């Protein structure tokens, strides 16, 4: 018996722009409405509405507050959407801040590109000639503050593991995905009585074991599974990231180095703060100050204190006992641009955590412009980096960098720390599927480049006998 149809309008063969339409004979539900990220050309795709009739949607479901899953949400009402939006309670609390921040950034980019003042940066490999400013596509204001306000009025926050009816013959239950504060898998129960079927969207899954976040929920089964594959061809390095960070801290303390750590505000920033807090407990921080240069990262920390169900056992028990596993005396929150600029002048032998994690925008680029030509600076990289981008080149030996046309030598040391990814690796994904009591009738792999999707599909077939589909963008698939 057919359950319905799936249409993937983003994150099919790529890792951004998540947007999937689930159609049944009685309902239409959009799962995620995220932004495309990467090159300026990728970002320009955000202005093109997906092939979805928003006026006919019963509901929109958001799996978590990362911009590639929720970034276009405030466009929905302008496109005709009049239904309800569902996410976890913790995600609800973060979404308003994420969308308002996005609206401010869009306004800034619109005016900067209109008057030719858009900031830019480029890392240069040995022998690579400096170039002029990149040709930015016309900036589009996808939405502004009024649209964010309208959107927030439509959102219903739902606690984990509580079933809620969201459309005719469709019920939704969120399961902890272990990825970032508030992140969830979306489990849909479709139909009535004995004919009910389960369609499970994994969302972005976290690693099987994390010192900070809870292990992702292990589903007993589902009829149809849509699974992410960001790290579908990767297997986690066995090295302990905490010991690598301890070495970086020891050197910084000895040599009075500035350490710059590009990181995502939700997920990576909290993981790093927790690691530094553990080093402080072990008396290994050596008095170094740590600056969190991201108000959004601070909100992510607060979300974990308010919703300890997203924490791993040890930090959860600390919070419930009244403790603070993401705090230590040398931790400082940087909440304004003035404070951010000040730490460039005052940090000697300190650590700065700043966005963006891809090193394509945000305060981290200003910190790099100030310090990348200094030998007493270390840049710490972790996680996935887009090919050809600033961080990708820096990791591979870039010897110069351009900031708004000015070329400076790269004298800073670059260190990579493995084991901090907020995504499940291939082994973690296999464990997730191995817990199914009965094999799903259909598995569709999205949210990954094609090589990652193919690698995961091959291993699922070989080891678990699960046949997989790799959906193409905008092509309906009957389930």
Regions from the PLM with identified roles:
Residues 12-17, 24-155, 205-214, 396-404, ...:
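Pre-active-site segment of Zn-dependent metallo-hydrolases
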Residues 100-105, 111-112, 241-243, 276-279, ...:
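Short secondary-structure boundary/capping segments
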Residues 84, 181, 185, 206-293, ...:
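Cap/insert and terminal regions of metallo-dependent hydrolase folds
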Residues 245-388, 462:
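Hard-cation-handling environments
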Residues 33-37, 58, 196-202, 208, ...:
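Acidic/glycine-enriched edge-of-secondary-structure segments
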Residues 102-176, 180, 308-348:
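Metallo-beta-lactamase
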Residues 6, 22, 32, 64-65, ...:
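Divalent metal-coordination and catalytic microenvironments
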Residues 1-55, 150-214, 338-345, 351, ...:
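Core dinuclear metal-dependent hydrolase active-site scaffold
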């Amino acid at each position: 018996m057919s359950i319905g149809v799936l249409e993937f309008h983003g994150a099919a063969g790529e890792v951004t722009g998540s947007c999937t339409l689930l159609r049944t004979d009685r309902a239409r539900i959009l799962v995620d409405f995220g932004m495309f990220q990467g090159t300026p050309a990728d970002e320009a795709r955000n202005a093109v509405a997906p092939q979805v009739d928003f006026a006919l949607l019963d509901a929109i479901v958001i799996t978590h507050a990362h911009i590639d899953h929720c970034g276009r949400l405030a466009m929905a009402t302008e496109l005709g959407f009049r239904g309800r939006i569902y996410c976890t309670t913790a995600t609800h609390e973060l979404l308003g801040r994420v969308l308002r921040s996005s609206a401010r950034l869009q306004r800034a980019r619109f005016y900067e590109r209109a008057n030719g003042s858009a900031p830019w940066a480029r890392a240069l490999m040995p022998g690579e000639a400096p170039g002029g400013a990149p040709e930015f596509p016309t900036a589009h204001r996808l939405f502004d503050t009024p649209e964010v306000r309208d959107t927030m009025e439509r959102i219903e926050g739902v606690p984990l593991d509580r079933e809620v009816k969201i459309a005719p013959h469709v019920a939704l239950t969120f399961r902890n995905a272990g990825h970032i504060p508030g992140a969830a898998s979306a489990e849909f129960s479709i139909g009535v009585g004995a004919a009910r079927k389960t369609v499970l969207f994994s969302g972005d899954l976290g690693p099987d074991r994390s010192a900070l976040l809870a292990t992702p929920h292990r589903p007993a089964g589902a009829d149809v599974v849509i699974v992410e594959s960001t790290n579908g061809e990767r297997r986690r390095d066995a090295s302990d990231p905490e010991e690598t960070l301890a070495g970086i801290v020891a050197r910084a303390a000895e040599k009075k180095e500035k350490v710059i750590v590009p990181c995502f505000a939700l997920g990576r920033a909290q993981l790093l703060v927790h690691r530094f807090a553990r080093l402080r407990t072990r008396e290994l921080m050596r008095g170094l100050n740590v600056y969190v240069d991201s108000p959004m990262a601070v909100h992510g920390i607060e979300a974990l204190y308010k919703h300890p169900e997203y924490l791993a056992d040890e930090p959860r028990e600390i919070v419930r006992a009244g403790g603070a596993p993401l705090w230590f005396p040398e931790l400082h929150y940087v909440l304004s641009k003035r404070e951010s600029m000040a730490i460039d002048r005052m940090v000697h032998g300190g650590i700065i955590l700043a966005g963006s994690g891809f090193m394509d925008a945000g305060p981290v680029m200003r910190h790099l412009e100030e310090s990348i030509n200094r030998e007493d600076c270390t840049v710490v990289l972790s996680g996935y980096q887009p090919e050809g981008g600033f961080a990708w080149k820096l990791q591979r030996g870039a010897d110069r960098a351009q900031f708004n046309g000015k070329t400076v030598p790269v004298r800073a040391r670059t260190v990579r720390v493995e084991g901090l990814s907020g995504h499940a690796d291939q082994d973690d994904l296999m464990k997730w599927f191995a817990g199914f009591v009965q094999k799903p009738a259909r598995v569709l792999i999205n949210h990954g480049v094609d090589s990652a999707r193919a690698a995961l599909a091959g291993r699922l077939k070989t080891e678990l006998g699960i046949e997989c589909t790799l959906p193409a963008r905008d092509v309906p698939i009957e389930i």
